[in-house]
Amino acid sequence: MFVSKIDISSPSFETNTKENKALLDKMNLLLERAAQTSEKRRDIFEKRNQLSPRERLGALLDPGLPFLELFNMAGYCVDDPDPETSIPGSSLIGGIGYVSGVKCLIYIDDSGINAGATTIKTIEKGLLLLEMAKKHKLPLVHLVESAGANLMQYKVELWALGGGAFAGLAEMSAMGIPIITVLHGLSTAGGAYMPGMSDYVIGVKENGMAALAGANLLRAATGEESSDKDLGGAEVHSKITGLVEYLAEDDKHAIEIAREVVKSLGWDRDFTGVSARNFLPPKYSSDEIIGSVPTDSVSYTHLTLPTKSGGGGG
């Protein structure tokens, strides 16, 4: 039996609690900043008959079940070093949640922020999400709408890291882990490889598009006149190239199809479950953790002691 050496009435415990709660409040405000910034483009989404990125997330997940967002502070004070204006998340919403009863890795381009443009931190975050999917054998569901690489912040490292993302997709395919992609909007340049390397692709009529170059770049490079829809619209890919397996009427319909695809995988059919072992409740309250950990990196702390079980099973 471990006995905690933490004195919850000590000045240091009170200081730690106060400082850690302040940090949590700050983080939540920053996450709300990201959500509000994305929400500013709601009028544009509505004009296109689209759902916003967070509405897509809500429609995809099973109601009432938990969603664990991962790496939500990625990119903060990196591309924009000003803490008063910097937006965390790297234009990407990622995490683990339940889709049609199946635990999945969720990967959503936040096209409400810089049109979902990709930076180095976006790719680094994406690579970590892919590693999570591979390690835990989680089906990957990617809701795509991105302007591609941010060429205004060009760095050669971006392309090297991007290649790592494609390698990760190939490894997932080799492992038999399903990849489901929904084309909600643009997916150009390197972004077009994502649906190309997926097992199931759902494209939204009129809005979904995947091509190595959009119409404007094609015109600038060759002088040829075309449209995004003719170059790589969802209709073209569903009827001619074969990239798109399912053609959806709108975002809501596309996500309904994605949920049906995940359900049809039978991913958990051979999983018999694990019986929970009997255990006694912890001797110490989990509320003590926040006051046990100092905010500076110099002070020591008894990390394990407050969370030890009161006895019985492990």
Name every feature range the model reports, one short phrase each.
Residues 1-93:
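N-terminal amphipathic, basic-rich helices that act as targeting or association modules
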Residues 13, 49-52, 106, 145, ...:
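Hydrophobic/aromatic residues within transmembrane alpha-helices
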Residues 86-90, 116-128:
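Glycine-rich anion/phosphate-binding loops
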Residues 93-110, 125-152:
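A structural preference for short, pocket-lining loop segments at secondary-structure junctions
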Residues 114-120, 154-157:
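Flexible beta-alpha connector loops of hexameric P-loop NTPases
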Residues 144-270:
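Conserved catalytic cores of soluble enzyme domains
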Residues 250-296:
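Terminal amphipathic helices with adjacent charged low-complexity linkers/tails
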Residues 301-307:
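Conserved small/polar residues in nucleotide/adenosyl-binding loops
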